[in-house]
Amino acid sequence: MRNNPVLPVSDPPLAGENDSDGKGVDDRLFKGSAMTKRGAYAALSYMACAVMLVLFNKAALSSYDFPCVNVITLFQMVSSSLFLYALRRRKIISFTAADSFSIDSASTFVPVKTLFHTLPLAIAYLLYMLASMASVRGVNVPMYTTLRRTTVAFTMVIEYMLTGQRYTRSIIGSVGIILLGAFFAGARDLSFDFYGYGVVFLANISTAVYLATIARTGKSSGLNSFGLMWSNGIICGPILMIWTFICGDLEKTINFPHLLTPGFMVVLLCSCVLAFVLNYCIFLNTTLNSALTQTICGNMKDLFTVGLGWMLFGGLPFDLMNVIGQLFGFFGSGLYAYYKIIGR
């Protein structure tokens, strides 16, 4: 094996494998194990990348008035696949836990049989992506924030159904505070829209299924974080390409007046790079910690996103109930992080 620099990956634990403290992986599934230093770095990296990505996407969609969200997602997905291809060809990364970098053919990066095995994850990812985009249009912003915060509850239920994962009372209590904060944040705007509610809850369910499926698919397929990202791109990329063509988004993109301006290209490039890093952090965070931890991190980064977005882009009306709800949500997320660090 050549002496190549290898990027850190999250390899799926093998059945019966022991970790560094001598305990089997399965023995810790139902306990409030403390977050490792590597897991903490993964969580912090995700939050930093997520905030930056939202700001760059906001710049592309608002500052430049780019009309096609799906095309940005397609660019990000294609860019991620190209990054993975280049890194794998140069043998800087591997796609499996036991990869010895002996495979030189791009066509055999991930066997077709393994791709079919990861199909449920890819479908969950595509549904999560499309439902999340549609949900923004279905309800107003306060209600959207309120309903999306309930994803933590969906994640706990889905994790229990798929993996039997259970949590301590401390963790459940912190999640309850987050849900209370979500209610306060949208309490002034509880207008009922059946279609809008349905789309947002579909986005919540698909998000929970996607996050819970990451660790499960990684363990059963033998793929690490990069391998799962590659499989997602190979399966979802062509589907999203066809979808954007049918919707007419590709034609709108070609006719976009700022498409080749340096400023827009820099914003789009940064968005694609950050999306690649963010997807890697999501896989790493979900595998090293849990799907629920990933969801909680998403709630914590909302506060920084709202603050930076208000300072850079403005347009955020002040509402005391919304502020109280945001603080409740941040407090609950902080409690969750504290309990994970001390192992309760």
Curated annotation (Swiss-Prot):
Region of interest: Disordered: 1-23
Membrane-spanning segments: 41-61, 66-86, 92-112, 114-134, 167-187, 194-214, 226-246, 264-284, 304-324
Subcellular location: Golgi apparatus membrane
Pfam families in UniProt: TPT (PF03151)
Primary residence: Golgi
Membrane topology: Multi-pass membrane protein
Cross-referenced InterPro entries: Sugar_P_trans_dom (IPR004853), TPT_transporter (IPR050186)
One Gene Ontology CC term in the entry: Golgi membrane
An annotated GO BP: UDP-N-acetylglucosamine transmembrane transport
Annotated tissue distribution: Expressed in roots, leaves, stems, flowers and siliques.
MF annotations from Gene Ontology: nucleotide-sugar transmembrane transporter activity
Highest taxon of source: Eukaryota
Reported consequences of knocking out the gene: No visible phenotype under normal growth conditions, but mutant plants have increased levels of high mannose N-glycans, decreased levels of complex N-glycans, and are insensitive to root growth inhibition by salt stress.
Keyword Transport: yes
Keyword terms of this UniProt record: Golgi apparatus, Membrane, Stress response, Sugar transport, Transmembrane, Transmembrane helix, Transport
Family according to the record: Belongs to the TPT transporter family. UGnT (TC 2.A.7.15) subfamily.
Role according to the record: Mediates the transport of UDP-N-acetylglucosamine (UDP-GlcNAc) across the Golgi apparatus membrane. Delivers an essential substrate for the maturation of N-glycans and the GlcNAc-containing glycosyl inositol phosphorylceramide (GIPC) class of sphingolipids in the Golgi apparatus.
Name used for this protein in its record: UDP-N-acetylglucosamine transporter UGNT1
Organism: Arabidopsis thaliana
